């Protein structure tokens, strides 16, 4: 993407910088932050902290009532470090009657924990994937059919960059889309984007074949630290082909270093009958069938913080995306000092709260989330066995 405008501000850690209006909670007498949409977080790991940062960046919209931790030691640590209310009591969390509960636990436990909180009558916004095996996916689908409310936090379609690109392609500028290459997100995230760009229904059958490679790569950045000593290690790269029964095809390519490494570029190539989009360039035929090209232009607002995590010390927030003079994206709630990922998750949070209140449909359907997780399961099987695996989506309807 092309930066057309750079602004920077210096802020302290949000835990210290923001002042919130408070009131006493009727449920437990605790002093809580007053916001528009109330939520709780189940879990206190790396991903859970995304929701904490979002709540602190959007106090006029969200109220984080509590973070549930399994141990008092963990609860005390999180409360002290982030200046938020934590608890080891599930009953206290349920008593808040939040708009939704974020399920941010270990992947292997997401399904069961989501079910537990749905059984309490609370709408859940669960981290990805929906589940790791087909039986668990069937269980979640049964809960959905029984009227329970679950949203899986598949955020990549809500990324400003993807929303803008999907809007541009949806305008018909490159005609009907038939194939794509994607090297941007792994497994279920990648599948979600493939289906979005290709216009694939969640119940569309497909075949998948793939292979895992290992290549020496210089290590640069992890979730928590940065390496500058030039160390090299073998890193995995998965390459696969998804061929859908409707005739459309997606070539998937993901490197294990891709999310953070500055030497592994994300790339998306989408081809249609009348043109193609390659990252921030679009090539198409005009009404006279003459070739044209335009650039997708992205402006960023840069926020520098004092956070010691190298991933959080500098936040690039999308300020505007346009192409050929037409605005494709602007932040609906203004600039908040959030990354693309956090902006996308915040959008899902707002839409989930509205869904809970019956004011809007689910922001990401259970069928979509199940289709993503199911495709990821088959991808792993194809890579492991070396075989071309065929899907059978009938079970979703059983």
Question: Which functions belong to the PLM regions below?
Answer:
Residues 231, 244, 258, 269, ...:
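C-terminal glycine/acidic-rich active-site capping loop/insertion
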Residues 17, 26-32, 36, 77-79, ...:
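C-terminal helix-rich "cap/oligomerization" subdomain common to oxidoreductases
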Residues 160-179:
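Rossmann-like NAD(P)H-binding beta-loop-alpha module
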Residues 4, 8-11, 15-16, 21-22:
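N-terminal amphipathic/hydrophobic targeting modules at extreme N-termini
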Residues 85-96:
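Short acidic low-complexity segments
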Residues 98-100, 106-107, 111-158:
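Beta-strand-loop-alpha-helix segment that lines the small-molecule cofactor/substrate pocket
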Residues 176-269, 283-285, 367, 371, ...:
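Rossmann-like dinucleotide-binding domain that binds NAD(P)(H)
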Residues 28-82, 96:
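N-terminal Rossmann-like dinucleotide-binding module
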